[in-house]
UniProtKB/Swiss-Prot annotation:
Name of the gene: recR
Protein name per UniProt: Recombination protein RecR
UniProt-listed NCBIfam families: recR (TIGR00615)
Family label: Belongs to the RecR family.
Keyword Zinc-finger: yes
Zn finger (C4-type) location: 58-75
Domain Toprim: 82-177
Pfam family name, one: Toprim_4
Gene3D superfamilies: 3.40.1360.10, RecR Domain 1
Keywords: DNA damage, DNA recombination, DNA repair, Metal-binding, Zinc, Zinc-finger
Length: 200
């Protein structure tokens, strides 16, 4: 069987690691790149290198830092410290910021609880979250997680974990399609779900 040159096979294997990219899509992208001007490929390689060395997360909230200020922009005193929004990924922070509905602080959990795979929350992040809530005493903790099995399980865990605190715990209202992640929810729908959040 005729095989691709190693440099193409290697690129395909890396592209396949991206979410939503299977072999056929990776193959198509690889051959599309063959048509690019070498300067374009070099520019993309440089962008990937800069991405690898430049991105950083805040040690307080785990949001992506958009500047070198400390605390980060999302932890600054200019934001409303009375509300803390719990999200799964740094990308979710930007989705909520686009909706312009939330002006408080964030905390990025990272991986969610998975009853199917047995994946657990990061104990280190949970400890940091507890310290932050106990130190800052926000009035409301808003759980803004995807309407999925993992999101539901994680939301329930957080509710139970922080039930001893005198803090309002709410979750996004109906309007967030079940099983859909923030990636596929437009800013207006997200804003309505946020403004209509309920205690649970």
């Amino acid at each position: 069987m005729l095989k691709y040159p190693d440099y193409i096979s290697k690129l395909i294997s890396f592209l396949k690691k991206l979410p939503g990219i299977g072999f056929k899509s990776a193959e198509k992208i690889a051959f599309e790149l063959l048509e690019w001007d070498p300067s374009q490929i070099e520019a993309m390689a440089q962008a990937l290198q800069e991405f690898s060395t430049s991105h950083a997360t805040c040690s307080n909230c785990f949001c992506l830092k958009i500047s070198q200020t400390s605390p980060c922009n999302f932890c600054s005193e200019s934001r409303d410290s009375s509300s803390l929004c719990i999200v799964a990924t740094p990308k979710d922070v930007f989705a909520l910021e686009k909706s312009k509905i939330f002006k408080g602080h964030y905390f990025v959990l990272g991986n969610l609880l998975s009853p199917i795979t047995g994946k657990h929350l990061s104990l280190e992040k949970l400890a940091i979250l507890k310290q932050r809530i106990e130190a800052c005493s926000p009035k409301e903790m808003i759980i803004a997680l995807d309407a999925t099995l993992e999101g539901d399980a994680t939301a329930l865990f957080l509710k139970q974990e922080f039930s001893y605190l005198p803090i309002k715990i709410s979750r996004l209202a109906l309007g967030m399609p079940v099983g859909l992640s923030f990636d596929f929810v437009d800013a207006n729908t997200l804003a309505r779900a946020f403004s209509g959040r309920n205690c649970f």
